[in-house]
């Protein structure tokens, strides 16, 4: 899938997330949590990368994080670089969907115990609620963009 096909696919994914409010409320925990500051509304424009963050062989840059105009859909985009041999991120699941676009190197996307190989130019997706992680599967750094779309996380 190239970037044009990916951008054509993104509106369908965004539309699908509007069907999630019942699922989102069912997945929320009863444990009280800290109140988060409201996220800004995302508007059309260009978003340059923010400052580098990370450690232990993994670095990243956030491009944007906020709410789409519909008001109930959160979107976030960042770029991650993993050095060879870096332990994968913690296995997790979320209320949102995650889409990866591999820029360079070889990554492994594991969802619900199934591992799939991704190379530069590939797109991977993890649907809301699936257990997942991404790991560097090569002997050179892997770099990928991540777009998350879905209801706000509690």
Label the model's feature ranges.
Residues 76-94:
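Conserved short histidine dyad/triad with adjacent acidic residue
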Residues 114-128:
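Short acidic-glycine-tyrosine-enriched beta hairpin
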Residues 128-153:
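Ligand-binding loop in jelly-roll beta-barrel domains
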């Amino acid at each position: 899938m190239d970037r044009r096909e990916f951008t054509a696919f993104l509106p369908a994914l965004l539309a699908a997330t509007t069907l999630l409010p019942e699922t989102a409320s069912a997945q929320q925990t009863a444990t009280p949590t800290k109140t988060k500051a409201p996220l800004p509304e995302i508007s059309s424009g260009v978003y340059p990368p923010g400052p580098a963050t990370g450690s232990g062989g993994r670095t990243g840059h956030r491009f944007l994080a906020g709410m789409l105009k519909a008001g109930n859909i959160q979107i976030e985009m960042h770029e991650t670089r993993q050095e060879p041999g870096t332990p994968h991120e913690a296995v997790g699941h979320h209320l949102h969907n995650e889409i990866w676009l591999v820029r360079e190197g070889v990554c492994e996307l594991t969802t619900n115990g199934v591992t799939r190989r991704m190379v530069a130019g590939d797109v991977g997706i993890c649907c809301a609620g699936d257990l997942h992680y991404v790991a560097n599967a090569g002997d050179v750094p892997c770099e990928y963009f991540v777009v998350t779309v879905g209801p706000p996380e509690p």
